[in-house]
């Protein structure tokens, strides 16, 4: 049986003499054509594919000794199967059933007693153990066959691995040599460059496909060996299990029949013996009683005969004697009856004790009989379950056989594909050799272009700053709000709208003229740019974007919107398309593109308002009491030229979407109130401070700047707003800070060295000290209303903007760390 199982196992295992020898011949033929690898590396050619320093990860994936987490080696699977079968084949040992203690096992303990009592040996245990030993021996033989096959597969996989390593190192050798020179750049350079990229990508794909095919081949071999080993082990296990169950079943039937027969025989013998003993005892008692009665009767008769002849003589004396004897007779009879009843009672007690003893002896036999019946039922259920398992194993085995056949066909197709791929790799190697000179020159030219690009970026920053200085470090843009149908429109003209719009004309009634139309006067104002009502925020930001670039180059930039309430300042600065979100989006996009040139930027945002000369953090969390405990004060670092505010919330800006959240949070916390000019008038100056920190890892350059985007409160005069109470106090504080802003700008434009600049006259100018002076670039938006009723305030705003536009401040300096 063992020899036949071994032959069937070895016949079902995959034979590698043909397929693996063919793989070895293909590997030897291919590796003989690959020269020894000589790797050349070039630190500047970062885009050229380099050989992998270690193939340990791929080797570990290809080694058949390491199995997937969900698949056991055939040996281990066979051992598990055999051990489980052995456990099922040893039902007479206490260890096979963990729920039953060794001393109380029904079969192991009582089979011996039954055999000793009835003279019948229990031989099924040794036969079942021999069957399990046969299963284990077949499992060991299947493992030896599988280990031989595994060593052959491992050698084939190592050959394939060495072949792949040689291909990669040869390709790396050729790729490292491909460094073209700029003097020999051919006309079709771009075509070859694209072709090389395609070849590199194709080679990488084929390499991954080869690795996957090798891994699939190894897994297929393992699964096939496992399936065959499991099939043989399952067959042998099922056969031994069936033999064991049949023997156990027949033995149990024989034992049950024997026990029932012996039990009936014992019961019958005990009953007969008991009846015989009772009959003997009763007959003995009766004989003794009869003998005693006869003795007494004989004595009485003899006495009567002895004294009868004296009765007549001694009548009186005999009567007395007769009465005495009669009493003695009665007492003797009473004693005899009492002795007989006591003897009967003793016999009955002895009978009861014997009956109880027999019943106690019968009860274990009945319990043993019931236990044997339960064991038979359990064995029948196990036999049924094992039959189901057998059927499942048969179906699984058929499925595994079909899968093995599919894998064999797939393996053959993969071997042909590998051969084709090897030929393609050889062809690609020749093509790479042809393109070696082109790649070498292209790489050198690329390095030169990178250096040139870095130099041009530095030059661009200088030229950009020069252009901005020529335009003026303080500039003024005028923007007219589009009419919203809320009143009569004023006469506003844009004479040079078709060219670089820089002039705005307003027709209004001159002061002191009559209402008949006499004294109409035309007012003209010139600024750096003038935007008509049709201009969108995107168009405005296109003009503004150059200053945002200056902020990224390391210059402090201050942009603020000035104008009366309702002139469109908040829409210009804080709407979804306003200057604040557009500026942040531009910085993000620009910083992403500058990463190729070595620049990295970090951004932090702060949002505050100045209300009645008090700084309020618009991003602070908590209730009003907690916010009031934080004291916000302005500190200036003279050496670094930097302004900081204590206890203010600073939010790192990692995405442009965070700016939208900042604007929403600030809008909820900003102070607004209804006035005569606007139902929702901003009663404070809002300041968005964006701190930029840039560094270039290639050149070692660093820059730091602050971008201030300010939405000033309404600039209408007290005579126009007619504010009272709390609104009056707010208007006075707003006008004071705006007046101080004009004084600072005027002092900066005086040009006299040592001139006192009144920064500390207001919180606004004190905060913007390093963003308004010669170390910065300033842009003022003057927003005006298109309504006729607002013309006086419009003229006042335009005159203030003209003063600012006529101011010249010093040259801005770049802030470095």
Swiss-Prot record:
Keyword annotations for this protein, in alphabetical order, are: ATP-binding, Coiled coil, Cytoplasm, Cytoskeleton, Isomerase, Microtubule, Motor protein, Nucleotide-binding, Nucleus
* UniProt biased composition (Polar residues): 39-60, 106-116
Read off the InterPro entries from this record. Answer: Kinesin-like_fam, Kinesin_motor_CS, Kinesin_motor_dom, Kinesin_motor_dom_sf, P-loop_NTPase
Which part of the chain is the Kinesin motor domain? 473-807
Q: Name the EC number(s).
A: 5.6.1.4
Show the ranges annotated as biased composition (Low complexity).
Answer: 8-23, 76-86, 122-132
Q: Which reactions fall under this protein's catalytic activity?
A: ATP + H2O = ADP + phosphate + H(+); ATP + H2O + a kinesin associated with a microtubule at position (n) = ADP + phosphate + a kinesin associated with a microtubule at position (n-1, toward the minus end)
Output one GO MF annotation: ATP binding
A single GO CC term for this protein reads:
kinetochore
Q: What are the subcellular locations of this protein?
A: Cytoplasm, Cytoskeleton; Cytoplasm, Cytoskeleton, Spindle; Nucleus
One of the GO BP terms on file = meiotic spindle assembly
Region described as Disordered: 1-155
List ligand-binding residues for ATP: 473, 475, 479, 543, 566-570, 778
Top-rank taxon, per record:
Eukaryota
Stretches of the chain forming a coiled coil according to its record: 155-242
Q: Which family does it belong to?
A: Belongs to the TRAFAC class myosin-kinesin ATPase superfamily. Kinesin family. NCD subfamily.
Q: What does this protein do?
A: Minus end-directed microtubule (MT) motor that is involved in spindle microtubule shortening, kinetochore capture, and polarization of cytoplasmic microtubules. During mitosis, promotes spindle microtubule shortening by depolymerization. During metaphase, involved in the recapture of kinetochores displaced from the spindle and their transport towards the spindle pole body; promotes transport both by microtubule end-on pulling and by lateral sliding along the side of the microtubule.
Q: What is this protein called?
A: Kinesin-like protein 2
The organism of origin for this protein: Schizosaccharomyces pombe (strain 972 / ATCC 24843) (Fission yeast)
Q: Which gene encodes it?
A: klp2
């Amino acid at each position: 049986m063992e020899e036949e199982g071994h032959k069937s196992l070895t016949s079902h295992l995959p034979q590698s003499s043909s397929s693996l020898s063919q793989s070895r011949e293909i590997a030897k033929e291919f590796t003989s054509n690959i020269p020894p690898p000589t790797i050349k590396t070039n630190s500047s050619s970062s885009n050229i594919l380099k050989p992998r320093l270690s193939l340990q990860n791929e080797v570990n994936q290809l080694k058949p000794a390491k199995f997937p987490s969900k698949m056991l080696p055939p040996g281990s699977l066979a051992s598990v199967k055999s051990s489980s079968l052995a456990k099922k084949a040893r039902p007479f040992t206490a260890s096979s059933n963990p729920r039953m203690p060794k001393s109380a096992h029904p079969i192991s303990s009582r089979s011996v007693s039954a055999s000793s009592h009835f003279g019948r040996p229990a031989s099924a245990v040794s036969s079942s153990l021999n069957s399990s030993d046969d299963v284990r021996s077949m499992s060991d033989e299947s493992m030896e066959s599988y280990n031989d096959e595994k060593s052959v597969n491992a050698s084939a996989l190592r050959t394939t691995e060495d072949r792949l390593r040689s291909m990669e190192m040869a390709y790396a050798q050729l790729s490292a040599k491909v460094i073209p020179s700029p003097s020999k750049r051919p006309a079709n350079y771009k075509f070859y460059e694209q072709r090389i990229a395609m070849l590199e990508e194709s080679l990488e794909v084929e390499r991954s496909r080869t690795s996957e095919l090798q891994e699939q081949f190894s897994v297929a071999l393992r699964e096939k060996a496992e399936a065959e080993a499991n099939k043989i082990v399952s067959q042998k296990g099922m056969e031994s299990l069936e033999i064991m169950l049949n023997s156990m079943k027949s033995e149990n039937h024989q034992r049950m029949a024997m026990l029932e027969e012996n039990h009936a025989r014992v019961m019958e013998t005990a009953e007969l013996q008991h009846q015989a003993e009772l009959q003997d005892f009763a007959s003995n008692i009766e004989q003794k009683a009869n003998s005693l009665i006869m003795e007494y009767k004989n004595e009485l008769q003899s006495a009567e005969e002895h004294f009868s002849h004296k009765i007549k003589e001694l009548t009186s004396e005999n009567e007395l004697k007769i009465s005495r004897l009669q009493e003695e007779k009665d007492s003797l009879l009473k004693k005899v009856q009492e002795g007989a009843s006591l003897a009967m009672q003793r016999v009955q007690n002895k009978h009861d004790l014997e009956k109880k003893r027999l019943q106690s002896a019968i009860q274990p036999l009945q319990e043993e009989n019931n236990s044997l019946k339960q064991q038979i039922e359990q064995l029948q259920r196990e036999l049924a379950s094992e039959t189901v398992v057998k059927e499942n194993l048969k179906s699984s085995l058929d499925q595994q056989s079909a899968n093995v056949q599919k894998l064999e066909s797939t393996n053959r197709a993969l071997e042909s594909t590998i051969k084709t791929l090897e030929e393609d790799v050889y062809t690609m190697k020749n093509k790479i050799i042809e393109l070696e000179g082109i790649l070498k020159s292209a790489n050198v030219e690329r390095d030169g272009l990178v250096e040139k690009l870095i130099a041009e970026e530095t030059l661009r920053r200088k030229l950009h700053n020069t252009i901005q200085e020529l335009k003026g470090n303080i500039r003024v843009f005028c923007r007219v709000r589009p009419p919203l149908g809320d009143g009569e429109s004023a006469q506003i003209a844009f004479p040079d709208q078709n060219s670089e719009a820089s002039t705005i004309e307003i027709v209004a009634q001159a002061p002191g003229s009559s209402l008949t139309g006499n004294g109409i006067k035309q007012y003209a104002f010139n600024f750096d740019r003038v935007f008509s009502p049709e201009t969108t925020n995107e168009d405005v930001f296109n003009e503004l974007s150059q200053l945002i670039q200056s902020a990224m180059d390391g210059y402090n930039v201050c942009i603020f919107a000035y104008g009366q309430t309702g002139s469109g300042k908040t829409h210009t600065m804080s709407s979804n398309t306003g200057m604040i979100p557009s500026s942040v989006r531009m910085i993000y996009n620009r910083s992403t593109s500058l990463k190729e040139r070595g620049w990295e930027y970090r951004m932090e945002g702060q949002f505050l308002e100045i209300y009645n000369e008090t700084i309020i953090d618009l991003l602070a969390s908590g209730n009003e009491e907690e916010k009031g405990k934080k004291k916000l004060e302005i500190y200036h670092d003279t050496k670094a030229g930097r302004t900081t505010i204590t206890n203010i919330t600073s939010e790192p800006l990692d995405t442009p979407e965070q700016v939208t959240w900042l604007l929403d949070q600030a809008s909820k916390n900003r102070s607004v109130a209804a006035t005569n000019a606007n139902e929702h008038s901003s009663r404070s100056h809002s300041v968005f401070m964006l701190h930029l920190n840039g560094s270039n890892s290639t050149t070692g350059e660093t820059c730091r700047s602050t971008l201030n985007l300010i939405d000033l409160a309404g600039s209408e005069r007290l005579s126009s707003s007619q504010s009272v109470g709390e609104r009056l106090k707010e208007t006075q504080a707003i006008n004071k800070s705006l007046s101080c802003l004009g004084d600072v700008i005027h002092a900066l434009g005086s040009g006299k060295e040592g001139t006192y600049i009144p920064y500390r006259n207001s919180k606004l100018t004190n905060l913007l000290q390093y963003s308004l002076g010669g170390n910065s670039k300033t842009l003022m938006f003057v927003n005006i209303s298109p309504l006729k009723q607002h013309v006086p305030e419009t003229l006042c705003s335009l005159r203030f903007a003209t003063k600012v536009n006529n101011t010249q401040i010093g040259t801005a300096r770049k802030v470095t760390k």
